[in-house]
UniProtKB/Swiss-Prot annotation:
UniProt protein name: Serine rich endogenous peptide 18
Region of interest (Disordered), ranges: 50-80
UniProt source species: Arabidopsis thaliana
The keyword Cell membrane belongs to this UniProt entry's keyword annotation: yes
Family as reported in the entry's similarity comment: Belongs to the serine rich endogenous peptide (SCOOP) phytocytokine family.
A GO term, aspect molecular function: receptor serine/threonine kinase binding
Motif (SCOOP motif): 45-59
CC per GO annotation: apoplast; plasma membrane
Annotated function: Brassicaceae-specific phytocytokine (plant endogenous peptide released into the apoplast) perceived by MIK2 in a BAK1/SERK3 and SERK4 coreceptors-dependent manner, that modulates various physiological and antimicrobial processes including growth prevention and reactive oxygen species (ROS) response regulation.
Residues spanning the signal sequence: 1-25
Quaternary assembly: Interacts with MIK2 (via extracellular leucine-rich repeat domain); this interaction triggers the formation of complex between MIK2 and the BAK1/SERK3 and SERK4 coreceptors, and subsequent BAK1 activation by phosphorylation.
Keywords from the named record: Apoplast, Cell membrane, Cleavage on pair of basic residues, Membrane, Secreted, Signal
Span of the annotated motif SxS motif essential for MIK2 binding: 51-53
Cell compartment(s), UniProt: Cell membrane; Secreted, Extracellular space, Apoplast
Amino acid sequence: MYNVVVCLLTLSFLLLTGLSNTAEARVPYEAREGVWDQKVITEIKAEVGGSCSPHAHGRGPPNRPGSSNIPGSPKRCTKP
């Protein structure tokens, strides 16, 4: 019984001292002008454009006009 009490006290002490050490070690957050915001990310996505991959078109119906892989069928994507 004595060993259990000593172990619980020791673990509690280590836990509490560890929590205070991590709180002291945190680096304060400083916002800089170089941080990317949602506007910059949206502009980059608009410049890049979509993919010609048949797997990148989303969850639409599989039988859309121009989405067939049959030779000679019209292709929907004309990107280089």
